[in-house]
Regions:
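Functionally important transmembrane alpha-helices
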Residues: 182-248
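Hydrophobic alpha-helical transmembrane segments
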Residues: 24-28, 61-63, 98-102, 106, ...
Length: 248
């Protein structure tokens, strides 16, 4: 309990003194890069394979997904080259951050289970039908061993790293100390949940994102939030395999 309280109230992130112009520059890099890299990866696969572009097929979803996610790393690299700022954070080491992340995941998942059940019951009550997301259907229906390995890599490794760079490493870090603590956590969490474009996953993702902000704030090291995010996605992938496949 004492360790949990330390995680909840600790703050190893100093105020990030970057210029508003640099912040907007990073946002532009992310938006433009995601469009360009995603289109480039899809076009490259279409050219190499000779297949027509089909965004309901696993190979093209993979190409688009990798382009979309890796654009965050490219945006972060360009931002680091151009922005000038002093780092005054006090991060813990990577192993300690991973430990914070593992503890955070265990705690938040216990919260997510009732959250998912109550949220789904609420949406069912007001007449909103559940629809399986395309990536879920594609994972369920499978593909070649290489395609499935790439899909799992994208979901469990690439997406957590790239999304944490944007939502926690940039957005939350920028708002931390500029807004009250609650708002600095809520704003990036709302954006994170909305960007997944799925009403059924909105509330669980909002709760998850709040936890991701808290563990990052507590450790000052993105490894903590990446650990939580990766474990969450891994559990979801395992659960998808346990659900009866639904034909597209």
């Amino acid at each position: 309990m004492e360790l949990l309280q330390k995680i909840l109230y600790a703050n190893r992130l100093a105020k990030w003194d970057i210029k508003p112009f640099d912040a907007w520059l990073f946002v532009c890099f992310v938006l433009l890069g995601s469009f360009l890299l995603s289109s480039l990866f899809v076009s490259a696969y279409s050219f190499i394979s000779g297949a027509e572009q089909d965004f309901e097929s696993l190979p093209f979803v993979l190409a688009s997904g990798f382009g979309l996610q890796l654009s965050s790393i490219l945006a972060w690299y360009l931002f680091k080259q151009l922005a000038i700022y002093e780092v005054r954070d006090q991060p813990v080491g990577c192993l300690a951050a991973a430990k914070v992340g593992a503890i955070g995941f265990a705690c938040v998942y216990l919260t997510l289970i009732p959250t998912m059940l109550i949220w789904r019951l609420f949406l069912d009550t007001i007449g909103i039908e559940y629809e399986f997301q395309l990536p879920v259907l594609l994972v369920q229906n499978g593909g070649s061993p290489v395609e499935m390995a790439l899909m799992i890599c994208l979901i469990v490794i690439v997406a957590p790293i790239c999304e944490e760079l944007v939502y926690r490493g940039f957005l939350f870090r920028y708002l931390n100390h500029r807004l009250p603590r609650g708002l600095s956590i809520l704003v990036p969490s709302l954006i994170f949940a909305l960007m997944h474009l799925n009403l059924y996953s909105f509330m669980p993702l909002l709760v998850l994102s709040i936890a991701l902000c808290i563990v990052y704030r507590a450790s000052g090291n993105l490894v903590s939030s990446i650990t939580v995010h990766a474990l969450f996605n891994l559990v979801n992938v395992l659960m998808i395999y346990l659900i009866e496949p639904i034909e597209l």
